[in-house]
Amino acid sequence: MSYIAFDKEKLVNINFAKEREILRCSRSGAFATTTLCGLNTRKYHGLFIVPQDNFNGERHLLVSGLNENIVVNDMDFHLSIHQYKGGAIDPKGNKYLQNFSADSVPVYDYRVGKFNFQKSMLFQHDADRLIIKYTFLDKVDEIALQVEPLLAFRNIHQLTHANSDVHTGFETVDNGVGFCMYNGYTPVYFQFSAPVDYEHHPDWYYNIEYEEELKRGYDGHEDLWRPGTLTAKVKGKELYLTIGTEPMDAAEIAKLYTSEAKKRTPRYNFASCLKNAAEQFIVKRNDRTDIIAGYPWFGRWGRDTFIALPGLTLAIGKISLFEEIADSMIADLKDGLFPNIGAGDNASYNSVDAPLWFIRSLQIYFDHVNKPRKLWTKYGDVIKQILCAYRDGTMNNIRMLENGLIYAGGPGLALTWMDAIVNGRPVTPRTGCQVEINALWYNAIKFALDLARSSRDKEFLTDWEPITVNFPAVFKDTFWSKEMGYLADYVDGDYKNFQVRPNMLIAASLPFSPISERLKQLVLKRVTEELLVDKGVRSLSPKDPEYKGHYMGTQAERDAAYHQGTVWPWLLFPLTDCMLHVYPDSAPDVLNRILYRFDGCMTYYGLSTVAEITDGDPPYKPNGCISQAWSVAALLYMKWKIEQVKK
């Protein structure tokens, strides 16, 4: 029995199947995603989604799907499934499904009449190319496969509607055809491993409906371009179809599939699923190596990159990959800040914590490699640039106060990870001195001082040691309340916000924490009593009148709940460090129990991966991105740290 598997009863149940989503990716940044039964319920669902260099590297959905028709002894069996305006579903190709498994690649077992066949797919590891394999298990006199491409050629965040600008032509290639709907795009080539007949009948396919978009208050209807039909007659047991941005030798398609299948990480248990999921976030393109923050809609985020970096690389033994990603991000450093989203001219530097998480990730890297001089030589100038920018002042009113604390933000700005904005106003306003930012700041300076001391950088020591001397006392005086028994979330002048949030957990988790051992215990106690649940850590205590236990409704309603009680698995990263430090003897077993609560998540929502968030209230339904980098990274980090302690 496969670890990830579903039988016919589950596959023909559309309500069951559409709550489970499949994701497959290439390291070049291309990916495919849909529901278990193949019904696209989001505008982000598609068969071939590819970064477009002519559009700032943004991901564009080129191929929404295929209308597939198996012709067996002159009988038609339509395998596709679509939902149309008003909710009508036709055809219902999922009725032919018998089994699904995903050991190394996703495999669907079909039965049409008395004829059985399999369909599997994978991406070429390092290219924008998808390969679909059809394996025919029974001998039949005559079989043909008819495929109609359904094209969109649009940004993943937008929708296509019928228009007269589309290019109606096609290009003939080896055993296939190519299409390009608009100028500036890479063409898409459909090629079979066998000879193909192509009938060109260009037209629009109207009113496809995406119900998840309607739930979020967005336009949920799309028209897709259907240029024609490719027909391949089956001779032998196997037939391959490749979809790529460049044509290839059709005779090599089968060999390429076989070669790529051998490279896949099998999904035979929970741990292997996490490792496989980690690999899907890594994109190597145009001389960069980046982390995709979450599928299907997030791109590269600075904050997410550095929080996820140790778990996605060091925790699974990929030290050189850590360096590749860090070096790629450093290229975009500006005024001591990393882009929160975007790159180049489209970069947005609205993150106060990304640079501090960068230094924290270097600290974990240092703990792993223990080469202080090498680290200071390679990254010392970058660390200095960041620290000096914060001390002297940089964008978005990020600056050091006279007492050494960092102040950040202003009207309309949301610079921490609690960054949701609705109607121009932050849902979680935190302008001022934020508790985790100042703890990360202190930790960054102390770590840098250790590195500088090993390299005898006397000038740096002279400049920065004085800042740390009184910092713990200032921090405690600013954030601690003996009456409350925990740390304030942020302070702005005389105002102190004492909502119970997980940011104080970050402050208590750091190697150079500005608080005492006793205060760490009290912070951890508060977090475990009010915030820790089965699938992560709540963003706000349910005792708070602003708490929202469910993430649902329109996008504005969801954003209003995003950091107001919603559970975040990534916070298990600082929880791991804090628990192992405060309770080193009992923590490993406690953390191990938390870790394996996610085992059941591998067969729900995003298959074989971990979601971005869950509801704050039971049963903690997963939501947001189906696969989130820092969620997966937190679990891999937790697993890694538990194993280190138990050695």
What annotation goes with each model-predicted range?
Residues 239-244, 442-445, 576:
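Short, well-ordered beta-strand elements
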